[in-house]
Amino acid sequence: MKKISLPKIGIRPVIDGRRMGVRESLEEQTMNMAKATAALLTEKLRHACGAAVECVISDTCIAGMAEAAACEEKFSSQNVGLTITVTPCWCYGSETIDMDPTRPKAIWGFNGTERPGAVYLAAALAAHSQKGIPAFSIYGHDVQDADDTSIPADVEEKLLRFARAGLAVASMKGKSYLSLGGVSMGIAGSIVDHNFFESWLGMKVQAVDMTELRRRIDQKIYDEAELEMALAWADKNFRYGEDENNKQYQRNAEQSRAVLRESLLMAMCIRDMMQGNSKLADIGRVEESLGYNAIAAGFQGQRHWTDQYPNGDTAEAILNSSFDWNGVREPFVVATENDSLNGVAMLMGHQLTGTAQVFADVRTYWSPEAIERVTGHKLDGLAEHGIIHLINSGSAALDGSCKQRDSEGNPTMKPHWEISQKEADACLAATEWCPAIHEYFRGGGYSSRFLTEGGVPFTMTRVNIIKGLGPVLQIAEGWSVELPKDVHDILNKRTNSTWPTTWFAPRLTGKGPFTDVYSVMANWGANHGVLTIGHVGADFITLASMLRIPVCMHNVEETKVYRPSAWAAHGMDIEGQDYRACQNYGPLYKR
């Protein structure tokens, strides 16, 4: 099949159309703004897959309806998914704006004195507001000279934030969520809401029974040579942890090998179901070779699969990581227990950063007093107000061990295009594979076990659906915390020591849900959350506003909150504005 092209960023230079001196004097400056914007975006951004971002500039400056239509025709033919309109001068507001109702759009009005770029910006935004097509405002804080072609830091920040979020919107549109299985143990996020995916994300849901996975394994609908490669890779790289099962439930070497083989096969088959695999056509399985065009997936597993077959922990952990037997590659997004709403938070984080995402239970709040009582240790530093134990049954991306290093040598999780094979190997070396606990997983399996290094900035997110309101997003920026080994061991053994752990300390504001760490835990809307590397809550807020998903909880500084200009007309409290604007405009792809 022809590979679907990636969305591009459209740049729209708009200009005062009056000839006989006005337009002519502005052509070069206006087009240079467009070129500078395109140069910035192509230099600083990449798609989540690692490919370079492409910008498409209008063939001419846009002064009115005819040139706007010509620009739109070009953009439509080149898969432009978001637009940035730029101008240093007055132009004709509603005659020059981008009118596509679902395409994210921003306007940069040059802050200069010679020509009123700010006046056009205000006029165009008024037209957008009146027509119900929200747009983002970009206006530099300081006046620039007319011949200054530099992009100020504050303008650059907004251009990049808008573009990152807009690319995420455009990249999700038209894709699918592969729901492999149904509802897992009554978890609400696995009651997959087709209307949410269609109306807010522009996606479809592909519902597939888990028997399809069984069929592919049993009928050998996979690349057998790749399976041998995967087994050899696991033999070389997997370290195995202790088997905590009672002796009657422990498997012998032959049985353990069969469990490992099936776990790796599950990873291969789920991947093939998501994105297709041309190798399957070579063995006569043309239909299966196409895949389901899935940008994210979820696997029910418990309990209808896991009571008989190996659990999804190994498959999910490998798919969610930035590497496997084929080397370093783009991580997939696969939600444990088919928690589609956590899967959407994972998808957002991956699209914004290009990094792997850590799926976890928001398991336990440990107060400083409780930790001191149980271990004798007094918390300090980032952990002084208490910590949250983020832990799940082994499906978290192995990148979450944070054995990768940034340019200053600090532990981190990198975009996959920056990860070396040495760093991938270090993440594998930091991971143990522990036999699944029989009482939970009767069909066996292996859970990955690692401990996230401390002092790493993270953003924890979660999407929830509220009846009568729709989807909402929660955001909590904070850091991973490193505890003394003996303290970690005592706390970890009180739950399940065969699973991966991140000790998380959210940044507190002293207000509302961020009054203290207990309040963060108490206000979290579900049993799962996602960790995305870095303090990127502002990017999530911008993305959510594009999709019309209100943010019900965040600890991002107010100066970093960036939403469409029309939000300001919905009241004076910025969080109340968000709710009213999202309700007023409705989901991006209204259905």
Swiss-Prot record:
Chief location bin: cytoplasm
InterPro entries from the UniProt entry: Fuc/Ara_isomerase_C, Fuc_iso_dom3_sf, Fuc_isomerase_C, Fucose_iso_dom1_sf, Fucose_iso_N1, Fucose_isomerase, Fucose_isomerase_dom2_sf, Fucose_isomerase_N/cen_sf
Class in the EC hierarchy, top level: isomerase
Organism from which the protein derives: Escherichia coli O139:H28 (strain E24377A / ETEC)
Cofactor: Mn(2+)
Subcellular location(s) of the protein: Cytoplasm
Catalytic activity: L-fucose = L-fuculose
Protein name: L-fucose isomerase
Binding site for Mn(2+): E337, D361, H528
Matches recorded under NCBIfam families: fucI, PRK10991.1
Keyword match Manganese: yes
Function per UniProt: Converts the aldose L-fucose into the corresponding ketose L-fuculose.
Record pathway: Carbohydrate degradation; L-fucose degradation; L-lactaldehyde and glycerone phosphate from L-fucose: step 1/3
Keywords recorded for this protein, A-Z: Carbohydrate metabolism, Cytoplasm, Fucose metabolism, Isomerase, Manganese, Metal-binding
Family to which this protein belongs: Belongs to the L-fucose isomerase family.
The EC number(s) this enzyme carries: 5.3.1.25
Assembly and oligomerization: Homohexamer.
Active site: E337 (proton acceptor), D361 (proton acceptor)
Top-level lineage group: Bacteria
GO biological process: D-arabinose catabolic process; L-fucose catabolic process
GO MF terms held by the record: arabinose isomerase activity; L-fucose isomerase activity; manganese ion binding
GO cellular component: cytoplasm
